[in-house]
Amino acid sequence: MDTAEEDICRVCRSEGTPEKPLYHPCVCTGSIKFIHQECLVQWLKHSRKEYCELCKHRFAFTPIYSPDMPSRLPIQDIFAGLVTSIGTAIRYWFHYTLVAFAWLGVVPLTACRIYKCLFTGSVSSLLTLPLDMLSTENLLADCLQGCFVVTCTLCAFISLVWLREQIVHGGAPIWLEHAAPPFNAAGHHQNEAPVGGNGAENPAADQPANPAGENAVLGENPDAQDGQAEEEEEDNEEEDDAGVEDAADANNGAQDDMNWNALEWDRAAEELTWERMLGLDGSLVFLEHVFWVVSLNTLFILVFAFCPYHIGHFSLVGLGFEEHVQASHFEGLITTIVGYILLAITLIICHALATLVKFHRSRRLLGVCYIVVKVSLLVVVEIGVFPLICGWWLDICSLEMFDATLKDRELSFQSAPGTTMFLHWLVGMVYVFYFASFILLLREVLRPGVLWFLRNLNDPDFNPVQEMIHLPIYRHLRRFILSVIVFGSIVLLMLWLPIRIIKSLLPNFLPYNVMLYSDAPVSELSLELLLLQVVLPALLEQGHTRQWLKGLVRAWTVTAGYLLDLHSYLLGDQEENENSANQQVNNNQPARNNNAVPAGEGLHAAHQAILQQGGPVGFQPYRRPLNFPLRIFLLIVFMCITLLIASLICLTLPVFAGRWLMSFWTGTAKIHELYTAACGLYVCWLTIRAVTVLVAWMPQGRRVIFQKVKEWSLMIMKTLIVAVLLAGVVPLLLGLLFELVIVAPLRVPLDQTPLFYPWQDWALGVLHAKIIAAITLMGPQWWLKTVIEQVYANGIRNIDLHYIIRKLAAPVISVLLLSLCVPYVIASGAVPLLGVTAEMQNLVHRRIYPFLLMVVVLMGILSFQVRQFKRLYEHIKNDKYLVGQRLVNYERKSGKQGPSTPPPVSSQE
């Protein structure tokens, strides 16, 4: 047993003295049990923690006050402290008001007024700009528009910085680094090596000079490589060695400048924080940042909006296309894009001239500007134009499904062009996203090397920006055209053709009912809540759907492989083929067949370096059967037939099942087809889920199946009880309470009787319950948060019905019932006993719910102010009379850290 002489501090390893005694403030024992208070305070300052890092026990300090401290603080001390606190609060209020006014008022308003001034196109607007800045006309609208302008300029600035980093770290194109013409086929050929078709002639295809070259939506035409090779030879003959050396020197100098800038930025970043930049630290340095932001906004508006717009405008006016552009309802956007295209052409010409006269710095600057414009245009095409084309094509091919015509779409576009274009762009983005997701699923099933012509999104080296920087523009245009053809053909196959077949076979099935208003007796809000809260989470949040789809794809692939003798080509061989000579014969194909390249060579190895999410998978060889092209053609035909049948099933079965089920609820009334389709999909999902579970249980025997059915039946019963309580009773009571407290007093006059609709109250209650649950989970720890977290942690399979009812459902329902019943009892039972008039009884009955809510809110505010005053009292007492703090020893018997004390401080007085 340790003695007092052997007790040493865990930090300084010294013994205790009368001046510096040892304490044992936490659960730790042995040689780390004791510590000096000074050592602990120093360590807390260093570690910035308030608890022991070993036992997680929170250290406790007891305050030491001056002996002359009175039992109660004098009124003058409290008043002085209160005045000081109010003064500090006012100072901070003024400062934060100035910060908000600067960032939310001055910056966006200045950006909007400057933007309008530049695009007005008159000299008078420039002369009256200072007065326009101070104008209060359309203040709120200009601030909102200015916020959008500032956001655009900020995104442009961040994109420029990011593009610079891509050029610095990923390397600039060869034609920019060397003194060669801008259309340097040698540079392009080297950067495009991983994308070409002739893998056997390009053994360096796997070099990572341009990993983004693999990001092709569709495969490139291998015949184009011959022309590129000829251009490469010509450009190599014309290359100037002296120009290369000068360009290299200029590049080194530019690299030194970039390194110096990086050091300066790092040095500035050490001093600059978000609080200091925005002015939240209490200083006025942010005013300088406001000035620089306004200047940056003006510069970016002038360079990236004003100049391209006017270049495009003057060009369109000169060519006589101004009327056609104005008829599109997007004159500004189209004119700006035309300006960027003309600017890119001008930069190419100037770059070529600078190369001829050997102005290397100017040549590099023009090349970088061309890259910026080129990447910007490609981003607009990839993210804006392509999804928009897909969305419009989907709409055109599905007109008969909704009993619409092109005239209807034209009228909707004329009435709301912005909304129409956005909706079509959104539909196109969803289509592209799910198409890419399906391709990823195919890569997990098929043999590596089958889908070499599709972009590999799982490749960690995939970088679309590097691809935009390095590949020439004609490659992007060719890829864009091929992508449009393929995506459009898939829409024809899976949408337009099934609709024609459905109209021929089931003439009364179409069109779908997509009217905005329904004559159904059921509230649309209730149906939307069921769709959002029940159906969509089950269809989207479950991983079973993806596994089912993957299993179907694998089954189809196996079937097609055995029917067409393409199992080796589609899925690969399970075991190694002993006849390696046959492998070489089967896999060594002419250049026009890109699928026939030996393992580890050429295009396939480059494209299939990483195919699946699990990690890298090499290219796998396959056995090539006789009549291979014919079998591939039959495979494509079989695939098209399968996709057509699958599309027919998806367009008819869920809607038919949903209409049949909803007819029991809504009768013969027509409702939106979204609800019927969602209901049918949910029923189909439940059916498939039940079938798959039963199939998985079949090998385990009848007894195990009965046991599983019993367990699942019990779990379903518990879940239904919990759902009735938490998803039925609680939302209904909550919605009814909200109706009585907020909606009825505001919307219904006193001389009218409010009407309550249980379905609408329940739907609103579901929303309110979800909001309250989310706020509770984000808030501090208290009993409701603890219970909800425990219920979430248990899940459905480990559901504890007794715990949920006792800890969650019963308390919440009791509080809601008391909130509903107590005011009603007071208004209907107690008030009439007082002998008041009928008008007063009606007034009390209608206003007692909001009145009691105000009383509860006032009591909460009063309680909060009392706690704040106690904190202020303690703060004043500590400032005036606190002389130090003493560490509290850990008491093992009570298991608690000691009396309630203020939090530990980082210094000792």
From Swiss-Prot:
> Which key words are in the record?
Acetylation, Endoplasmic reticulum, Membrane, Metal-binding, Transferase, Transmembrane, Transmembrane helix, Ubl conjugation, Ubl conjugation pathway, Zinc, Zinc-finger
The protein, known as: E3 ubiquitin-protein ligase MARCHF6
Question: Where do the annotations place Zn(2+) 2 binding?
Answer: C26, C28, C52, C55
What is the membrane topology here? Multi-pass membrane protein
- On this chain, the residues bearing N-acetylmethionine are M1
Catalytic reaction equation(s): S-ubiquitinyl-[E2 ubiquitin-conjugating enzyme]-L-cysteine + [acceptor protein]-L-lysine = [E2 ubiquitin-conjugating enzyme]-L-cysteine + N(6)-ubiquitinyl-[acceptor protein]-L-lysine
Q: Where in the cell is it found?
A: Endoplasmic reticulum membrane
Task: Give an example GO cellular component term for this record.
Answer: endoplasmic reticulum membrane
What EC designation does it have? 2.3.2.27
- The membrane spanning regions, by residue number, are 92-112, 143-163, 284-304, 337-357, 377-397, 422-442, 481-501, 520-540, 632-652, 678-698, 721-741, 764-784, 815-835, 848-868
Report the CDD domains cross-referenced here: RING_CH-C4HC3_MARCH6
Q: Which organism is it from?
A: Mus musculus (Mouse)
Q: Name one GO biological process term.
A: protein K48-linked ubiquitination
